[in-house]
Design a protein with these regions (language model features):
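Non-catalytic terminal/accessory segments
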Residues: 1-190
């Protein structure tokens, strides 16, 4: 919100880190215009949308709610990391190509469920659905490569039935931060 407060916070971080012999990385630490009024201020000055930043596996963006136009922060999984995860899954699927489908399905379920457990935050549902769809497509490609005869049997409809059987459904499991903090206040944790 306030540039002076943000600068003071950065100085305090430098001081605190120095006590433990640590330093903030200059290329990864910067002040950006972000927050409740950033969109309005940038529109007033005819500037583009507020900058985004990556933190803890998510790209954070200033946004407004569709219904009321209130400020909110959208968190989307970092695209580069999603691609890297899908590439690792693809490599593992190729190694497990001739394993029984049920065994591969159980393995995929645990991998996808672990990914969803972390990334299932509000405003990220599109990324979750896309991730599960991509895993399904990768699995279909590997199944079709198993034999020449089996290629025509494995249609997208059949693969979707198999995916529904083995892969978890993408859904938001983490609450909005304000709901989480409200629960902590009621419990007396803060």
């Amino acid at each position: 919100e306030n540039h002076n407060e943000a600068s003071a916070c950065v100085e305090a971080l430098h001081t605190r880190f120095a006590q433990f012999g640590l330093k903030l990385h200059k290329d990864k630490t910067r002040l950006i215009e972000f927050g409740k009024y950033a969109i309005e201020r940038r529109e007033r000055h005819s500037e583009s949308r507020p900058e985004t930043f990556n933190f803890l596996g998510f790209t954070h963006k200033c946004a407004q709610t569709k219904e009321h136009g209130w400020f909110t922060i959208h968190r989307h999984s970092i695209a580069k990391r999603v691609r890297a995860t899908l590439q690792k899954i693809k490599e593992q699927l190729r190694k497990r190509m001739h394993r029984p489908i049920g065994e591969t399905g159980r393995w995929l379920r645990s991998v996808v469920q672990g990914w969803l457990n972390y990334h299932a935050v509000p405003s990220n549902s599109h990324c979750l659905c896309r991730f599960v769809d991509e895993v399904t497509r990768l699995w279909l490609a590997v199944i079709r490569r198993r034999s020449q005869r089996g290629r025509s049997k494995w249609t997208w409809d059949r693969m979707q039935r198999l995916a529904r059987l083995h892969l978890p459904r993408p859904r938001i499991t983490h609450p909005y931060p304000n709901q989480r903090f409200r629960a902590r206040l009621k419990a007396g944790a803060v």
